[in-house]
Amino acid sequence: MIQKLLARDFFNNKEQPIILEPRAPQEIFPEHTHDFDELVIVKHGSGRHILNGYPHDLYPGVVLYIQAQDHHSYENLQDLCLTNILIQSNNNFKYLNNIDILLNGLKPENSSYQLINKKTAEYIDSLLEKINAIDESYNLQNECLFFQVLSSIQAHQFNDSGYGNTEEKGRQMIRWLENNFEKEIDWEELAEKFALPIRTLHRYIKSQTGHTPQNYVTKLRLAQAYYQLKYTEKNIINIAYDCGFNDSSYFSTCFKNEYSIAPRELRI
């Protein structure tokens, strides 16, 4: 049975719209759901997040919006530190209207999570510190600060322009990989696309994800395969090819190394 976390165990009253719940570090947590929404910002470390059956690696700068009806869990954690902004109900905001539009824009799309750069993360931290310092009865100030948090995240989402400093280009590149991992990747062409030296490309992906570029792409492909194995009736060989693997035997070996279970066993 999936555990359900209740708002009454976190919020001070039914009218309180948001509350901060830091996790430093986040512990392994089994699959669960809530009767409130949650905005999660990864501050440090790494781990695997499984949202509605779809696994995804976490690393600093990842942002995701989790709705009450979603079910998710954390595993394979390595000093993972999170800032969780719990949202009791959009209707509890007195001054912010239609905030669900902003929040829904931050909802993960399977392999693709939102990313913010280091400068934005530091600015958001300063806003959250102010929220923590203000009495919860000061609704206007708190809601203004929360709106600034959402606006900052929205303003620094992925584009594939190849503009900006090295960090901005690097994060654009990672988001591109998350949306195109099933394709054959030519790393020289990708480096040129995002105006990065090839060594910088390799170094940046390694520093952000903890994996070499090719290993990171393999993990993205395996995550998509995991989801399709659990929630579709597609043939295993077809899943392997659709996710970017050219050899089904190699796919099976990689899958078992990643999830400690063979693709066929996952379907039993």
From Swiss-Prot:
The keyword DNA-binding applies. Gene3D superfamilies: Homeodomain-like, Jelly Rolls. GO terms for biological process: positive regulation of DNA-templated transcription; rhamnose metabolic process. One of its GO terms (cellular component) is cytoplasm. GO terms for molecular function: DNA-binding transcription factor activity; sequence-specific DNA binding. CDD domains: cupin_RhaR_RhaS-like_N (cd06977). Residues 171-268 form the HTH araC/xylS-type domain. Pfam families: AraC_binding, HTH_18. Residues 188-209, 236-259 bind DNA. The record marks 247 as: Interaction with sigma-70. SMART domains: HTH_ARAC. Activates expression of the rhaBAD and rhaT operons. Binds DNA as a dimer. This is HTH-type transcriptional activator RhaS. It comes from Mannheimia succiniciproducens (strain KCTC 0769BP / MBEL55E). The lineage of its organism: Bacteria, Pseudomonadati, Pseudomonadota, Gammaproteobacteria, Pasteurellales. The gene is rhaS.
